[in-house]
């Protein structure tokens, strides 16, 4: 069995975690983490959108309807990129593009059209019908609903983009101080810390390294006996 990718859940919300399913966005060769519909289902399982049994049901249904699953995967990527552009723009102080909001609206409309009232422990809740198995589009619906919730409730000043040169992941800073800088301290933050450490080490080594100079043969001040036998030996600079 192929080893599954462990998705990072550092975005602070489901929709931002979906946006971050492209690794090294700012590099010349970004890495797609959703190459198949099965990977989309695995992302949904790891993110808590579906249970493990529901994920297996989705994969079986995708096997029976491969063309439908492929179309939903394509829609998921389009939605992901729209989410990324919207929230990365807000993090930079730019308003969203109408075309990207239209993508969100389209998926959100379908998601809410499928919602229905479901009994809960205390009253009712809005949920998607699962009696006949989870719909193949369920991961998209959950991400679109999450994006709407963040857009309508989160402080845009708390939206940030990881400053690492090749990363570009976005996240919602939910720390009390609002000073979170990296997508994940154990990832980009740790690498930046290591680079600063090695830079200091190299700088310190260069500053403390002794410098040597060599006298040219026959230079002034060299003893006559050494001029006769050849070049003088290098002497330590004062």
Task: Give residue spans per PLM region.
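Basic DNA-binding region of bZIP-type proteins
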Residues: 187-207, 211, 218, 222
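Extended mid-to-C-terminal alpha-helical interaction segments
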Residues: 155-177, 194-204
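Short helix-coil boundary/hinge micro-motifs
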Residues: 1-160, 168, 208-238
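Cysteine-rich micro-motifs
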Residues: 178-189
